[in-house]
Amino acid sequence: MRDDRHMNAYRVVIVTLDRHAAGPAARVTPRLQADFPGITVDIFAAAEWGNNPAAFAECEAALREADIVIANLLFLEEHVAPIMPHLLAARERCDAFVGMITDGQIVRLTKMGDLDMSKPASAAMQLLKSLRGSKGPSAASGEKQMKMLRRLPKILRFLPGKAQDLRAWFLSMQYWLGGSDDNIEQMLRFLVSRYATGRTWAKTSAKAPIDYPDVGLYHPALRDRITTRLADLPRPAEARATVGLLVLRSYVLADDRAHYDAVIAAFEAQGLAVVPAFAGGLDGRPAIEAYFQGPHGPTVDAMVSLTGFSLVGGPAYNDSPAAVAALSALDVPYIAAHPLEFQTLAQWAASGGGLGPVETTMLIALPEIDGATNPTVFAGRHGTETCTGCARRCAGASDVRAMAPCPERIGALADKVARLATLRRSRVADRRVAIVLYGFPPNAGAVGTAAYLSVFESLHNTLLAMAAEGYDVTPPATVEDLRAAVLQGNAAQFGQPANVAAHVGADDIVARTPWLAEVEAAWGPAPGRIQSDGRGVFVLGAQFGKVMVGIQPVFGYEGDPMRLLFEKGFAPTHAFTTFYRWLREDFGADALLHFGMHGALEFMPGKQAGMGPGCWPDRLIGGLPNIYLYAANNPSEATLAKRRSNAITVTHLTPPLAQAGLYKGLLELKDSLKRWRATDPDAEELSELEGLIAEQAAAVDLGGVAPAALWIKLLETEDALIPDGLHVLGRRPDAAAMAGYLDILAGDDAEKRADYAAKLALDSEIPALLRALAGRFIAPVPGGDLIRSPDILPTGRNIHAFDPFRMPTEFALRDGAKQAQRLLEAHPTLPRSIALVLWGSDNIKSDGGPIGQALALIGARPRFDSYGRLSGADLIPLAE
């Protein structure tokens, strides 16, 4: 027992990830105080420490006075590292320390009576290990572990000595996982009665844990709130579609569910039938198998996760292959919405960046690896400040700080989900699709271009495939006819760079633009001067049946287009806002297809991640499903499209590579260098030749480089691989291109050549676009350069950046070390200092190669936690 002056108090301190158990703890404390006078129960959430240093200080102070400590769900290094010394100190003086469902080093702090998990395994622990059995990857493994958790206390009950404290540990876990008010109360009664010392309280017995379904259904309209029978759920008489909703069992049992209730109500208001399901063990697959998947296919039209975690693994890890297998079998759109745990709603609303690094990793990046799309904030906790995210100005701080819904964001989420779900149910011939082309740089004759892609050839093949699929579209006969219809048509009549599909009058713009004041502050009165005749705005493009091929308007700053994209306080032009509103409301698009890399929508002003109602990408696209054709080698910018414009990306192959060769000027320089290399060092003409080389080098911007280094540089330039031509969707690589790909990817390895040849020949890109337009699941794939990351094959998948807990990879570390050594060898003496610019895109494409180079130069190596996740770096001892 602790030794301090507060002898009348007895303090139970719970340190965990979030505050979902704060409500039960607050509600049961008065009942506990009737039997245990002076007892207090305090919960501290590690998620609050990053943005609220005072919260960490309060936790630290509480641990100094703790009599019983319960620590769980602490897995992140930024949570474990700072609190670990205080947990260690508390362990030495408290009556009991219970570490469960948490990082291994915290579990080993467990001290309950004779049970000390910091010591070598005892006979009881060996028995436990044998009873646990093997750990399998299937969804059933979690169910088996929960059954074992219930069985073990019954078995251990008959073993003497230390086994009884081991039984107490398992019972504590069982109470916690069934975290209702009753179970939290009985857990605390059990621990205090068994382990409190120096007290004269009467011994009380705790009731056994109440068992709740590990896999079940929740709905606020149910009498008991939870059930295991689908037939018990309320269902609209004529539902537009059915949506499967994944919720956290712990929040449902803790009665912290106002945010779930608000989502269910908003979805049902959209005419959707909602199936809110939960599963224990932070593995959503059992819920999918039980309630979303039938014997003949999916029983839902879309699936939405409200957990804020990856589908399989939660905050500790993510088993993305298992998640992808389950989601591919379900084959419906998978949307990941997230509650804010690491900041309040007011902090998020006021933030220019939106989500912080840890939130972005846990709430967005890890679900993306599973194949999740449309990341949307839907809830959070209120602090003392009013949320300024929208006109509602929500507030509502309480002592327990329960989860609060964000009504505006939930409305946006409901719109997105309803559109995706009904898209899947719609008849192909009824679907209206808007395909968006770009022109960048503006005013440079680049309308209808995209990086690495032959746009009009690819678009023509796509339209032909859509017609064959049953879409109401009549493609022009040839590629040139398509190009002429879009870029010429009536363009000359209106003095525009492309065909005019519609004219939107200034009065219409004024009446129907919700953010008119912001646009006019930047661009003057409507209709502005961009793509305008002074009376209104032109919408450029051409319509082919129910498919509209539109051209995204220019940014507005022709001389400096990046100004609009990267400076805060700006707004898109009248033409830009009108274009997307016209596609949504006047053309009536059911889905958008942004065709190639890349447009400007995702770069418009707003938060970096965790979009709010004031963010322009969110305003412009609204709830429209957004399919985005993207080059497979650019995951960094594709990630922006996914996180800022709700894009479901579909990768396409980059063009075949060829040796760059040398052009005029460089060829002449090479000839001179050849002569220099063949000239005797003592020859009289050597000095004259070196002067000529210096002149030729300066003419091609290589001045100041010694001839020997110039020779190496020219050879590297000549042999460099560059894209050869443009990629065409629906066209398999010809023999020469195929040979070029295979030589680079596989060399002389016959088995690899056959494997890559099959993947390269697969016609997967247009079929993937059609699947996305039909509301099907698009499997994820890490993006990257084809040479370094051949796993991008086959294309036609949903690109993501990287697992932030797995970068740099082992290969990247070795390659980075080689690059660091080459850098040092390029200098005659060891440099005193080196500056590196670490570009996100370069690291993403190389799995962290530049980071590996930086670590090698520093003399450090990455540090990984007990789950194999990158958690920091350590200096390498000089002895090594």
Language-model features, listed with the residues they occupy:
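Ligand/cofactor-recognition surfaces for anionic moieties
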Residues: M1-E880
